[in-house]
Design a protein with these regions (language model features):
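Surface-exposed strand-loop-strand hairpins of Gram-negative outer-membrane beta-barrel proteins
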Residues: 1-21, 173-175
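Residues that define the transmembrane beta-barrel architecture of outer-membrane proteins
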Residues: 12-18, 80-84, 101, 146-150, ...
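Short loop/turn motifs that connect adjacent beta-strands in outer-membrane beta-barrel proteins
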Residues: 27-34, 95-103, 118
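Extracellular/periplasm-exposed beta-strand and loop segments of Gram-negative cell-envelope proteins
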Residues: 5-13, 47-58, 62-81, 114-126, ...
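Transmembrane beta-barrel domains of outer membrane proteins
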Residues: 23-27, 77, 89-93, 153-157, ...
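Transmembrane beta-strands of outer-membrane beta-barrel proteins
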Residues: 34-40, 84-86, 103-111, 152-154, ...
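Predominantly the C-terminal beta-signal and adjacent terminal strand-loop region
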Residues: 136-193
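Transmembrane beta-strands of outer-membrane beta-barrel pores
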Residues: 1-3, 40-48, 92-94, 109-117, ...
Length: 193
């Protein structure tokens, strides 16, 4: 989801995020319930648009979001981003000897470098929703997007499952190229934390 998104940008309710990280846990010597986790991995996100498109390959001074309510449009249209990231967490586990059966909590931050931005469109339709062709179009271009990001994270759970939240502190777009959009995510995590 996007915080700061103008009302003129019509996104569908939920996007899809997949994050995979390999992390190492370093328990405190003075208190085994606390530890620091550091690692590296990939974070990706997809935002879906309702009768809209994003002109990431355009030549305009700002990123253009097109409203296609009364025009030809694609049945499915998404904007996807991917980052290589380095997360750092401060972790708490209620019972360090049985971490797979105890309460856990973590707060942290991630720094990331943008490795991919693309749009993908499937099945062109007329303004009434009738299928015109079953084509797929994919466009890659990074010029409007910040190449680095900083995100704050939090997790709380039991055993290997937890609820997860992330808020991107830096804007999605470069300064001056559009609205200050800050993505945020909520979801489920499978982890050995």
């Amino acid at each position: 989801m996007w915080n700061g998104k103008p009302d003129s940008i019509k996104t569908k309710s939920l996007g899809r995020d997949i994050n995979v990280y390999f992390m190492f846990d370093f328990p405190f010597k003075t208190n085994k319930k606390l530890s620091v986790g550091i690692g590296a991995g990939i974070g990706s996100a997809s935002v879906f648009f309702d009768r809209g498109s994003v002109d990431i390959a355009g030549n305009a001074n700002r990123l253009v979001f097109n409203n296609l309510d009364t025009l030809q449009h694609y049945k499915k249209y998404k904007l996807a981003t991917a980052y290589v990231e380095a997360p750092v967490e401060l972790r708490y586990v209620q019972n360090p000897e049985r971490s797979d059966r105890s309460f856990k909590f973590a707060i942290g931050a991630k720094v990331g470098a943008l490795i991919d931005v693309h749009t993908r469109a499937k099945e062109l339709r007329d303004k009434n929703g009738n299928s015109l062709n079953n084509s797929t179009e994919k466009i890659k271009q990074k010029k409007y997007f910040n190449t680095n990001r900083l995100s704050l994270t939090a997790r709380v759970g039991w055993g290997n499952f937890s609820l997860y939240g992330q808020y991107q502190v830096t804007g999605l777009l470069k300064d001056g190229f559009g609205a200050v959009i800050r993505p945020y995510t909520f979801g489920l995590t499978l982890s050995g934390l």
